[in-house]
């Protein structure tokens, strides 16, 4: 992979008023021209992280995720981790909130502030050497729904509970 194509995007980062939308557009366009056309990018406005954690704390006090529903989520691992470790945060929220449209609307408004710019190619490349279709991409991956208990020596189902995000959102 090429990483960040600075020759094509640096001008959008280095100006006094960065143009993150154009950065995302050029980043994705760069990868779409490659022989390996796989990429995702999310620009995160960190001043909204605590607000999102507070909203998710309210949600997690009311709703409990059933890992049997993980198949409904956008997998961002492909075949690398089994069971999946990383899912799309937006996919998770949409499924978790279910029919609570008021809460989901609040989430969407906050998410638009937290991730004002995002982009993805039609597929992503996985560490296992396979590709995964991207049907939904919010700009953030999340491991909260993961039931992975030990692949590669990491018990994600337990380790995720030791993160600052988990403490702030549960």
Predicted regions and their residues:
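Terminal, contiguous helix-loop blocks that mediate binding/assembly
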Residues: 1-170
């Amino acid at each position: 992979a090429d990483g960040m194509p600075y020759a094509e995007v640096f001008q959008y980062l280095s100006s006094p008023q960065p143009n993150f939308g154009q950065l995302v557009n050029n980043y994705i366009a760069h990868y779409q021209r490659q022989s390996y056309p796989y990429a995702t990018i999310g620009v995160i406005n960190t001043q909204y992280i605590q607000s999102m954690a507070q909203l998710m704390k309210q949600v997690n006090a009311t709703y409990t995720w059933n890992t049997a529903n993980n198949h409904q989520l956008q997998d961002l691992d492909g075949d690398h981790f089994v069971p999946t470790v990383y899912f799309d945060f937006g996919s998770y929220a949409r499924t978790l909130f279910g029919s609570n449209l008021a809460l989901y609307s609040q989430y969407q408004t906050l998410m638009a502030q937290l991730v004002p710019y995002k982009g993805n190619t039609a597929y992503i490349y996985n560490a296992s050497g396979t590709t995964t279709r991207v049907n939904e991409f919010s700009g953030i991956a999340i491991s909260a729904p993961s039931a992975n208990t030990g692949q590669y020596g990491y018990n994600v189902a337990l380790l995720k509970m030791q993160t600052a995000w988990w403490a702030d959102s549960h």
